[in-house]
Amino acid sequence: MKAKEIRDLTTSEIEEQIKSSKEELFNLRFQLATGQLEETARIRTVRKTIARLKTVAREREIEQSKANQ
């Protein structure tokens, strides 16, 4: 998911995406540990997606705090 696509989401949708991505990452790591994971690059992709989601969420927090001051 691109940062531009993430910015189009609402804050609650971003939080939901973070939650589902973390669950997916957990499952991928479990598959890796048991030797069932074939596409190991997927772990990296999911981690980067989580980082993008958290970055946009933090940007919104900062904007909101500046608006309140």
Curated annotation (Swiss-Prot):
The organism's superkingdom is given as: Bacteria
Coiled-coil-forming residues are: none
Which GO biological-process labels does this protein carry? translation
Q: Name one GO molecular function term.
A: structural constituent of ribosome
Which InterPro entries did the record assign?
Ribosomal_protein_uL29, Ribosomal_uL29, Ribosomal_uL29_sf
Has UniProt tagged this entry with the keyword Ribonucleoprotein? Answer: yes
Q: Name one GO cellular component term.
A: cytosolic large ribosomal subunit
**What's the short name of a Pfam family annotated to this entry?**
Ribosomal_L29
Entry's SUPFAM superfamilies? Answer: Ribosomal protein L29 (L29p)
Annotated keywords: Ribonucleoprotein, Ribosomal protein
- Family listed: Belongs to the universal ribosomal protein uL29 family.
Name this protein carries in UniProt: Large ribosomal subunit protein uL29
- Taxonomic source organism: Staphylococcus aureus (strain NCTC 8325 / PS 47)
Q: What is the lineage of its organism?
A: Bacteria, Bacillati, Bacillota, Bacilli, Bacillales
